[in-house]
Amino acid sequence: MATTFEPAYLNLPAGELKRRVDQAWVRLEDCDLCPRDCHVNRRQTTKGTVCRAGERAVVASFGPHFGEESCLVGRHGSGTIFFSWCNLRCQFCQNYDISQLGEGREAAPEEIAAMMLDLQERGCHNINFVTPSHVVPQILAAVAIAAERGLRIPLVYNTGGYDALISLKLLDSVVDIYMPDVKYADESLARKYSKVRNYTAAHK
């Protein structure tokens, strides 16, 4: 007999999601949300950051996506939100205009929440955050708003595999599916092609 799946974020203790949001915003003020450890107050400036993202996330596009794994796509698509900018500098990136040039528009958490609810209304089976590592606070804030307004589908964290442990702890029991796109098993290649240190240690 089929059972109804309930997303992890709906099972958090009362007030826990808000606490995670508050913690994440504090970390953004001395940013250590990825292993770059830029320690820049991103609520005030993007100068000195690698990801070039500030207090507001930049969204390149959102909509039902049918190019993901079949278990995510189902019949109506994976509800994908593509975030602009990135904490990696991959020379081979297929979305260079998004990840390196930052094409897209700034979106407040309320707007991202509205996107999530729209994707749910369109029948998408999940919310798929693509390139999320540098916008964890913004995502958590949006999830908190969307959950209060009726979001009831699973969350997918579609990452490049360069996430700080603190970020993963903030996302624990919020995200349902982690989908790391691991790019390197050789540290020298990570430095050469993505200008990143400790990549292999970070994704383990």
Residue ranges, per PLM feature:
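Functionally constrained cores in energy, signaling, and assembly domains
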Residues: N11, E29, D37, G79, ...
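C-terminal scaffold of the Radical SAM
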Residues: L170-M179, Y184-K204
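Flexible, acidic/Gly-rich N-terminal and inter-domain linker regions that tether
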Residues: M1-S78
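Short N-terminal micro-motifs specific to bacterial/archaeal maturation
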Residues: D22-W25, E103, V130, D181, ...
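Conserved Radical SAM active-site core
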Residues: K47, C51-I177, D186-E187
